[in-house]
């Protein structure tokens, strides 16, 4: 796969000549804005761990995607998630479905580069104290495959751990636009789990085309899909819940949450994602809803 090295510090392409640290850039860009059960097609890992990398990807540079989270269930990677604030993650509903009452089995691993280096000094591990699955989630149709996780303790923002911007309702990302996916999921359909975080570039696909190429599903306005007609680059089992992100005004913006697909990287079978912009008000309401009266 043709791939260009795109950035060193997470928020700005490397060619921009900026010497600012990611943390300083974060302060500048974000501090003024307000905190804004699985099935074959799901891209989560099965409990046995025999299911789970980005297909056609390359090793990410360390620190390239500081909002990337590895969600561990009973001590092993099961899904991805994105950090969207000091104590909130966005992931896929199917990752947490049926496991949302067993909070003690979950841990969120942030600042991670390789699964084998969990004890690296950049890594921050947090327990989860609340999981909220979107009430419109439908396991069969894959509608509203999105969930939020609240961390027991907020993370510390560092060069390695930073939140991603969320796509707003009015932002339009046209078909053909190249965006990035990342994850520790399988490197091929039925393939193995990588140690190092993988990333790949995929073009966004027109909504009608998504429906045509994924006729088994009703492709709604709260979904989007991405991939090459010839296949070969895609998210796969173990990538679910992770980010589909586009560089917009020098900021990485989360536009999709890895949701489902038919196989991985097959020609004419783009990967499907929950469309973040369709859920921005739900995300904001969930953040605001008081914490104490729900527990």
Regions found by a protein language model. Give the residues of each.
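Extracellular trypsin-like serine protease catalytic domains
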Residues: 68-74, 177-295
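Conserved active-site neighborhood of the chymotrypsin/trypsin-like protease fold
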Residues: 89-93, 143-168, 196, 291-292
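Extracellular/periplasmic catalytic domains that process cell-envelope and extracellular macromolecules
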Residues: 60-64, 83, 100-102, 139-142, ...
């Amino acid at each position: 796969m043709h791939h260009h090295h795109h950035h060193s510090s997470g928020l700005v392409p490397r060619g921009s000549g900026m010497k600012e640290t990611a943390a300083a850039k974060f302060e500048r860009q974000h501090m003024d804005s307000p905190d804004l059960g699985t099935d074959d097609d799901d891209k989560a890992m099965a409990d046995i761990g025999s299911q789970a990398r980005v297909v056609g990807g390359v090793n990410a540079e360390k620190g390239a995607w500081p909002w990337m989270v590895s969600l561990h269930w009973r001590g092993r990677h099961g899904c991805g998630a994105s950090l969207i604030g000091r104590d909130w993650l966005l992931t896929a509903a199917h990752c947490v479905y049926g496991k949302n009452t067993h909070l003690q089995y979950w841990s969120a691993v942030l600042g991670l580069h390789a699964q084998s280096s969990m004890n690296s000094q950049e890594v921050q591990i947090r327990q989860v104290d609340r999981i909220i699955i979107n009430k419109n989630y439908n396991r069969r149709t894959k509608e509203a495959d999105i969930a939020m996780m609240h961390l027991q303790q907020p993370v510390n923002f560092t060069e390695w751990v930073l939140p991603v911007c969320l796509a707003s309702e009015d932002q339009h990302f046209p078909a053909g636009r190249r965006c990035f996916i990342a994850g520790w999921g399988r490197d091929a359909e039925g393939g193995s789990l990588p140690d190092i975080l993988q990333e790949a570039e995929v073009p966004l696909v027109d909504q009608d085309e998504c429906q045509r190429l994924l006729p088994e599903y009703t492709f709604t306005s709260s979904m989007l899909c991405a991939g090459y007609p010839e296949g070969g680059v895609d998210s796969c089992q173990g990538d679910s819940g992770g980010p589909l992100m586009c560089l917009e005004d020098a900021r990485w913006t989360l536009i999709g949450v890895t949701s489902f697909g038919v196989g991985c990287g097959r020609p004419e079978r783009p990967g499907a994602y929950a469309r973040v912009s369709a859920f921005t008000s739900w995300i904001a309401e969930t953040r605001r809803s008081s914490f104490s009266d729900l527990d």
